[in-house]
């Protein structure tokens, strides 16, 4: 996987990120880009690791992903969490799927052999509803639309012209992939418990924004 860059947004992840980077030492990726929102504690915690730390310019999870992709140079990029919930053992399988004529590969907690140790009833039900909406409104062939463990061809990521600066990015990515008729597939994965820190998602506020974005993309075809 010498042509793969991992994009890791990191906000208040000093407890978990060093453990994540230590685990990633066992995997042969070309580069790891940490998008740091001026968090001195997190930056200090990873100063002995080989990675590129980029200071985030705009606020939000989506902005961190977009800025990370813009800094990448490799053929492939993968969105990866700083909290330890994404298991890197799936990277190789996703990479092989990309090399089998796919432009994007989504990890899914809800395919057979997938699962989650971090889901709550609220996030489970919400994800099922949003995934169903994706199928109905956009004919998306996905089982886990809110899980952003996504690997893709960098040139095709750039063609999406992503704009969302928050968690609405998890809807924008698959909707634009579908509209542009890019090839994508999914693999089962198990979401682990986070290694430290706190969740950044506000289930109610972010859920409302995601719902709004569904209907916005449905009504505005060229956005």
What residues fall within each predicted segment?
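Short, well-formed alpha-helical segments that are part of the catalytic scaffolds
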Residues: 12-26
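Acceptor/aglycone-binding surface of glycosyltransferases and processive sugar-polymer synthases
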Residues: 57-59, 63-71, 76-79, 89-167, ...
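Short beta-strand/loop segment that forms part of the nucleotide-sugar
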Residues: 21, 29-38, 54-55
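Cell-envelope/extracellular polymer assembly enzymes that use nucleotide-activated donors
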Residues: 3-5, 172
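Donor nucleotide-sugar binding loop of glycosyltransferases
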Residues: 13-16, 61, 87
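A conserved acidic beta->alpha catalytic loop
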Residues: 35-44, 84
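Acidic helix N-cap motif at the loop->helix transition within catalytic regions
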Residues: 15-19, 40-48
